[in-house]
Regions:
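Active-site-adjacent structural elements in enzyme catalytic cores
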Residues: 1-190
Length: 190
């Protein structure tokens, strides 16, 4: 709740702090279309869960930029959300390629996984948890982005590099938030 209080301070008359969220990603947003739904923004209610009760289509703009002249169908679809105030990039590549790419990068934050020992030894490394634990990634993501932004404001971080996350289940919501925070900047390393 600390980050929510800091982000909303002075903008809300009252803040009720009820503790940490179980998931940490905003709600799932869908649009009813015929007998099914179009997923506009993924969240803790996953496409797989929705598919158990109705047909599900993913919005064409789910993980792509929405044009300036296009009205967003859901909050969070158009603009960089929870993005650090420094450039951010998603790294798409093998462990070795990511380690090599980051080896000579200083003054940057790295969002990685518990198994990334070489990366975790860095001064500004932030772990999302075990690579396969998307629920942990969802729970930790916004706190990590807020911590990075605080350090960026102190001048300690000039850029952010995040490992590509698994996109299944709630991982789709994590990937969606990361890709938007990065302004759709993906560096392919392999």
């Amino acid at each position: 709740p600390r980050h929510a209080i800091e982000n909303m301070y002075g903008r809300a008359d009252c803040i009720i702090a009820a503790g940490d969220c179980d998931y940490g990603v905003e709600s799932t947003v869908v649009k009813i279309e015929g007998e099914g739904v179009v997923l506009l923004r993924p969240g803790a209610v996953t496409p797989e869960m929705l598919a158990e009760v109705c047909p599900v289509k993913l919005s064409e703009t789910l993980n792509r930029p929405v044009g300036e002249s296009v009205a967003p169908e859901s909050p969070g679809m158009k603009y960089r959300h929870y993005a650090p105030d420094v450039p951010m990039y998603i790294l798409d590549g093998s462990d070795e390629a990511v380690y090599e790419f980051l080896r000579d990068k200083d003054d940057c934050a790295v969002i990685c996984f518990d198994g990334d020992r070489e990366l975790l030894a860095r001064e500004h490394a932030f772990s999302l948890g075990d690579r396969a634990d998307s629920a942990s990634h969802a729970h930790r993501l916004f706190a990590i982005l807020n911590d990075i932004n605080a350090q960026a404001h102190d001048g300690k971080i000039k850029a952010v590099y995040a490992r590509m996350t698994p996109a299944g289940g709630v991982g789709l919501a994590v990937f969606n938030r990361l890709i938007k925070a990065a302004g759709y900047n993906v560096i392919k390393l392999d």
